[in-house]
């Protein structure tokens, strides 16, 4: 089969997420301590998760559901019962600064993206989160020269697996489902969304247990560089 475009998820597909998230939360906690909040790390994590749960519940299915500034804002509100804009900004900025500083592409990602482009394929990043943050990540990772299109869920108002997250980048690149590959680490977002529209789906960096009860991807790979063996 001849492909014309490859769509990649960003977070935990092109770089490892857990280490970045941990660095961000640690920095936010340290900032909270400097601001006078009497939180142990465990207490901070509990407050952060409480704020996160509320945001996820209220904003499910939107890009803002992932916004750490909202998590920090809500955590402070729940803890203090008051509005503290400067503190919420400080914690959110500390989180993202440390997160981005920790980011590093998985081995072989740049070489793989370059090989795909050299073979004439369009490369897109299709990601669930707000645009400013994802632009910051793209810049920090040096991906612009290797990616033809970035689409965030903030741009569509819907999150993967919503069809618009796949149909819009296909329309912009002038390709159809049978010509397009979706590569990601999420069965529910990347694989299910791609499968529903007839894209070829590739699951990477994911545990086998994630597939239980779900339709299978067309291919499974352990790392992004293996993609060239599948597609080229």
Language model segments and positions:
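Active-site neighborhood of HAD-like aspartate-dependent phosphohydrolases
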Residues: 1-8, 13-47
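Conserved phosphate-coordination/catalytic loops
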Residues: 66, 103-107, 159-160
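Asp-based, Mg2+/Mn2+-dependent phosphohydrolase catalytic module
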Residues: 1-6, 18-19, 110, 114-117, ...
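Short, surface-exposed acidic
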Residues: 33-46, 79-92, 146
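Short, acidic loop-to-helix structural element flanking the phosphoryl-transfer center
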Residues: 86, 97-123, 226
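Alpha-helical substrate-recognition element adjacent to the catalytic core
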Residues: 36-66
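A metal-dependent, Asp-based hydrolase signature
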Residues: 54-94
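Hydrophobic alpha-helical core bundles mediating ligand binding, dimerization, or RNAP-core interactions
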Residues: 21-29, 47-52, 72, 92-99, ...
């Amino acid at each position: 089969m001849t492909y014309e475009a490859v769509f990649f998820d960003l977070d935990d597909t092109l770089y490892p997420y857990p280490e970045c998230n941990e660095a961000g939360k640690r920095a936010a906690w340290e900032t909270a301590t400097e601001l006078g909040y009497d939180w142990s790390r465990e207490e901070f994590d509990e407050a952060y998760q409480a704020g996160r749960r509320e945001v996820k519940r209220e904003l499910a299915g939107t890009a803002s559901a992932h916004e750490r500034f909202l998590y920090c804002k809500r955590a402070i509100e729940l803890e203090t019962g008051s509005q503290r804009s400067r503190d919420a900004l400080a914690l959110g900025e500390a989180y993202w600064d440390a997160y981005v500083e920790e980011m590093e592409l998985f081995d072989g990602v740049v070489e793989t993206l370059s090989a795909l482009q050299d073979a004439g394929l369009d490369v897109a990043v299709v990601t669930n989160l707000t645009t400013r943050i994802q632009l910051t990540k793209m810049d920090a990772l040096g991906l612009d020269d290797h990616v033809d299109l970035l689409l965030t869920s903030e741009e569509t108002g819907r999150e993967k697996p919503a069809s618009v997250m796949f149909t819009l980048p296909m329309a912009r690149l002038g390709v159809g489902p049978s010509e397009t590959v979706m590569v990601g680490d999420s069965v529910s977002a990347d694989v299910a969304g791609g499968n529903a529209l007839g894209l070829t789906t590739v699951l990477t960096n994911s545990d086998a247990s994630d597939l239980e009860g779900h339709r299978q991807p067309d291919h499974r790979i352990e790392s992004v560089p293996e993609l060239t063996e599948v597609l080229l």
